[in-house]
Structure formats: structure tokens, C-alpha cells
Regions:
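Catalytic-core region of carbohydrate-active enzymes that cleave or remodel glycosidic bonds
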Residues: 220-222, 241-303
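Ligand-binding face of N-terminal immunoglobulin V-set domains in extracellular IgSF glycoproteins
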Residues: 1-3
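Active-site mouth of glycoside hydrolases
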Residues: 9-249, 253-259
Length: 303
């Protein structure tokens, strides 16, 4: 079955694929990268849009409102979780739908303050950095636990390019340490997690290494740590991380899928630490992976 609870913790074992601890099954990721503000959901406590969201670009959904996922209400099933007298059915239904289509991972930001969506954060308000919203995080936990049952990895993007200097001006200071500590304390027990240092990340080499080292020091389950960057910046971002003991691989944004995947697989072997190389954003941005009707074999994203 799909339920991760029958498979054990998903671990990095020094190979190019993650492996479930109990069954030994290898994990080949295939999932949803959009919407990145998946947790910007209208029925979570303390969730609102601060300021004006980023402008709507070609191929994007309306940016002015929180997600409702109304078409997926019908995908909720009796016995599935809810909170506060029936809230949460739509987002739970959305996850049911993804699992029914064979997906096994969902990419989502845990903080987009001052970013594109401006509607996801773990604190009591968008301008708070030290007090965490317990009821909201309890509701996230309900969703994440359902993902375990559905066999969906939590690919948690801890920041994005617009806000990667927001906490401690980009350093590993008290704000960032508390943020990482809260995420790990609340959610690291889940069986399949990837911690992503940031979308289109602009921190320094030293900062990225410090973040990864700190996360691994705190996470008792040693979930993999990866990082996403801009196309064209792979060498600048990933080369200094080759062989680094606290980093497990790149989170690629490209339409040159085969060549870049092979390149970083090969380079990681040469550096003595095999990476899991994942393709997490496929260009062009306004289409990504096309619908089955337009590209039935999805050959465009395999080349």
C-alpha cells in the first residue's frame, strides 16, 4: 500500500535515491510543485494575506485571495480528518486527489512573508518572529499526518528568494534558529520529509552550510537537506556543496532535465558523496509539465 507507516522512515543512505528504513523500498519522487503557497489556505487559523501579493503572471492563478480548493471538497472521504467542526475538507480532498493520481510528494513553502504569496508563516502574525501560532501549527500537523497515510512526502521549502535575508539578515541567528527548531520539533517525526534551504536561494555558501549543519544537528531522524536555485546559478550554488556531509542534493529548476540531472549525479559521485538529484521546477514557468492531453508521454520534460 501507499501508507508510509508500513514502510518506516524515508532516509538518505548514501545513494542516489532515498530508501524506506523498514521495507528497503527505494523512493522515486514524482509530485506537485504548485501551488507553492499550498498552506495559504482559508480554513487555517491565523492565515491571511499581508500587503499586496505579487502580480499575476501568465499561466498563474489569481493572486489576491487565499486558497479554498473548492473543487476538491468532493474528494474528501468519510473518516478523513477535519478540525473545528468540519473545516479542512477541501485541502484534505486535494491531497486525496493527488495521491489517487499516483503522486508521492508535495512541495510547499512554510514561510513566504514578503514573498510572492504573503500568506504562509508559522508565527502568530506576519511580523512576529518569536511567538508561534500553536493552533495553526496543530492544523498543519493534521494535514501532514494525513499525507503520511496517503504516502505523500512533505517537501518543505523553508524560505524563498524574496525573504531569504528576512531572518537575522540572512545569518544563522536567534530568529532563524527558533524557526528551524520549531519546524523540526513539530514535524520531524513525519516519515518522509525533505528540508529545502530555500527557493531560488541567494544566501552565501557559508550561510547555506551553516543552515544545513544546524538542521541536521537538531533533526533526530536526519531527513535530507536540499537547496533550490535559479537556472544558470547551479555551479555557483552547488559546486561548493559537493561532498559536504550535511547536504544531500540539488533541487533543480530547469528545462534541460536530462543533461543537468546526469551532470550533478556524476559530479556528486566524483566528490565522494552521492546526491539525490531532483527536478522540482520545470520550465517554461507558465506551463511546467503540460496536461496529458497536450503531451501524453511527457517527452518534452524528459529531454
Amino acid at each position: 500500500g501507499r501508507d508510509h507507516r508500513a514502510k518506516g522512515m524515508l532516509r538518505y543512505v548514501g545513494q542516489h535515491y532515498l530508501q524506506f528504513a523498514e521495507t528497503g523500498e527505494w523512493f522515486i519522487k514524482g509530485g506537485a510543485d504548485s501551488p507553492e503557497n499550498f498552506l495559504g489556505y482559508v480554513e487555517f487559523d491565523g492565515t491571511y494575506r499581508h500587503g499586496k501579493a505579487g502580480g499575476r503572471r501568465r499561466g498563474e492563478a489569481e493572486a489576491s485571495k487565499l486558497h479554498r480548493y473548492e473543487p476538491h471538497r468532493r474528494d474528501w472521504r468519510p473518516g478523513d480528518p477535519t478540525w473545528r467542526d468540519g473545516k479542512g475538507r477541501n485541502i484534505i480532498g486535494a491531497l486525496n486527489y493527488l495521491a489517487s493520481k499516483g503522486m508521492n510528494s508535495v512541495y510547499m513553502l512554510t514561510m513566504n512573508v514578503t514573498g510572492d504569496g504573503k500568506d504562509v508563516w508559522p508565527w502568530t502574525s506576519h511580523d512576529e518572529r518569536f511567538r508561534f501560532d500553536c493552533s495553526k501549527l496543530d492544523q498543519w500537523e493534521i494535514v501532514f499526518s494525513h499525507m503520511d497515510r496517503l504516502g505523500l512526502m512533505l517537501h518543505l521549502i523553508t524560505q524563498e528568494t524574496e525573504n531569504d535575508q528576512l531572518l537575522d539578515r540572512g545569518e544563522l541567528g536567534i530568529e532563524r534558529k527558533l524557526y528551524y527548531r520549531e519546524l523540526i520539533a513539530r514535524f520531524a517525526h513525519h516519515l518522509a520529509i525533505t528540508w529545502n534551504l530555500g527557493e531560488e536561494n541567494t544566501n552565501t555558501d557559508a550561510q547555506r552550510k551553516a543552515f544545513a549543519r544546524y538542521i541536521h544537528a537538531l533533526d533526530p531522524y536526519d531527513h535530507p537537506v536540499v537547496c533550490h536555485t535559479f537556472p544558470g546559478r547551479y555551479d555557483r550554488i552547488y559546486e561548493p556543496l559537493l561532498g559536504y556531509e550535511h547536504f544531500e542534493g540539488p533541487s533543480l529548476q530547469t528545462n534541460d532535465t536530462h543533461r543537468q540531472t546526469l551532470r550533478w549525479v556524476t559530479r556528486s559521485v566524483a566528490a565522494g558523496r552521492k546526491w539525490i538529484v531532483c527536478l522540482d521546477e520545470i520550465g517554461p514557468a507558465n506551463t511546467g509539465v503540460k496536461p496529458d492531453a497536450d503531451d501524453p508521454a511527457h517527452d518534452e520534460v524528459r529531454t
